[in-house]
């Protein structure tokens, strides 16, 4: 099923939550960027250099952005400290080994850089299942595609073990989604 208008609306809400945390002129890696690397386009006025990595994209340039076909279960194909920000919007809930992926994200973030995450709260699952049953959202938005939920406190502890120092967390979309910014 192709992305629907509701899918795009929900994605834009995530983009709006993440956007203020991108420093102007920064180097950004969007892990799990999707076919269109849409967040890089959305935040283009703040991004000096952008790379989108996803297992569904073809390697090459997409406008100003480099697309890299890659699997998040493998080591990231980037040098240590290469990015000011790593963005993972609605990706965490799909990972079977989140600590491994988050450790790799930490490795490629420069000193004073940040990891910007969004993920849905458990309250959203019945809503997603209903929207999916009505064919109003794509298959990958359905809650059956999601792994075990990580509570905010457990995620923060995991990120501290990895090496992140400071955290900003807030809920958005009337509490149905979370934003966390973790700083190196």
Give the location of each predicted region:
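Conserved N-terminal segment of class I S-adenosyl-L-methionine
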Residues: 1-79, 85, 102, 142-148, ...
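Feature marks short, surface-exposed loop/turn motifs that line or immediately flank catalytic pockets
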Residues: 59, 112, 123-125
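Histidine-centered divalent metal-coordination motifs
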Residues: 94
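A structural motif corresponding to the C-terminal end of an alpha-helix
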Residues: 158-164
């Amino acid at each position: 099923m192709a992305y629907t208008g509701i899918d795009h609306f929900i994605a834009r809400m995530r983009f709006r939550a993440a956007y203020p945390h991108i420093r102007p002129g920064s180097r950004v890696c969007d892990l799990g960027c999707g076919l269109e690397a849409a967040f890089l386009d959305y935040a283009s006025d703040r991004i000096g250099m952008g790379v989108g990595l996803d297992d569904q994209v073809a390697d090459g340039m997409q406008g100003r952005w480099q697309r890299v076909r890659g699997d998040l279960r493998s080591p990231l194909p980037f040098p240590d400290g290469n990015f000011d920000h790593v963005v993972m919007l609605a990706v965490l809930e799909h990972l079977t080994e989140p600590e491994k992926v988050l450790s790799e994200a930490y490795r490629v973030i420069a000193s004073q850089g940040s990891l910007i995450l969004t993920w849905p709260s458990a309250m959203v699952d019945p809503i997603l299942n209903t929207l999916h049953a009505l064919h109003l959202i794509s298959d990958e938005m359905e809650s059956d595609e999601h792994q075990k939920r990580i509570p905010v406190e457990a995620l923060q502890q995991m990120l501290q073990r990895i090496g992140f120092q400071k955290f900003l967390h807030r809920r958005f979309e009337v509490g149905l989604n979370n934003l966390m910014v973790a700083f190196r």
